Design a protein with these regions (language model features):
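Structural alpha/beta surface segment adjacent to cysteine/selenocysteine redox centers
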Residues: 17-103
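C-terminal cap of thioredoxin/glutaredoxin-like
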Residues: 5-7, 21-26, 102-218
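N-terminal cysteine/histidine-rich coordination modules
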Residues: 1-6, 32
């Protein structure tokens, strides 16, 4: 079995490309892979987002607004997760496409329109958005990210249980994530090669304990 933790900016254009392209190549491993997509909000990820959008990172008001925006989008994504893997991933990709790529304003109307397109329960979604459960799930994701040493988005941690290792491989940034399909091969030699090539950190399996394995997206 392969366990993948993918950390993203829920309205990030770079994260959109990472999810849409490389992850589509993982479908042939569908029976072996458990994928979890977790939103990440921290100073570094917000800074990267601002830089990509040509925002002044020294503008504290602008930084605060961007942080709140990513946080709100993260809660919306976590609320969508409560309605299942297909709805959540569809909603996430729509958010990233419209807000991150097309640069539409993140608004109540847009969120409702995009969620309605997923065929999820809109009334339930609106109730869940600010619920304590959703906030708790979001904070759990931030704890997992911290334990795994995640600082930027997109990043991923891959556990290949077919290899004799009790740690995962950390891929930081879009370029590193190009190695994701190769890490899903069950060859121990291949895993070791990519591990050396990327000089990656080694998160321990203990970090898996804080993750809700019911929220599996692939």
């Amino acid at each position: 079995m392969i366990e993948i933790f993918l950390f993203v900016n829920p309205i990030g254009p770079i994260c959109y490309q990472v999810e849409k392209e490389p992850l589509e190549n993982l479908t042939k491993y569908r029976k072996k892979i458990h994928l979890q997509i977790l939103p990440l909000v921290n100073l570094t990820s917000v800074g990267v987002s601002m830089e990509y959008l040509s925002m002044d990172k020294t503008d504290l008001l602008l930084r605060n607004d961007q942080t709140k925006l990513i946080y709100t989008a993260s809660l919306d994504y976590k609320a969508a997760q409560l309605q299942g893997k297909k709805i959540a991933r569809d909603f996430l990709l729509k958010l990233q496409q419209h807000v991150g790529v097309d640069k539409k304003a993140y608004s109540e109307q847009l969120v409702q329109e995009l969620f309605s397109e997923t065929r999820g329960d809109l009334t339930m979604f609106l109730e869940d958005r600010q619920s304590e459960l959703v906030k708790k799930n979001f904070l759990t994701d931030q704890t997992v990210a911290k334990d795994m040493g995640i600082t930027i988005t997109p990043s991923a941690v891959v556990y290949n249980f077919a290899c004799e290792r009790e740690y995962g491989v950390l891929l930081e940034g879009a370029m590193a994530l190009a190695s994701l399909p190769a890490l899903c091969e069950t060859s121990d030699d291949q895993f070791a090669f990519l591990e050396r090539k990327n000089a990656l950190k080694k998160p321990t399996l203990s970090t898996l304990q804080g993750v809700d394995h019911k929220l599996i997206l692939l």
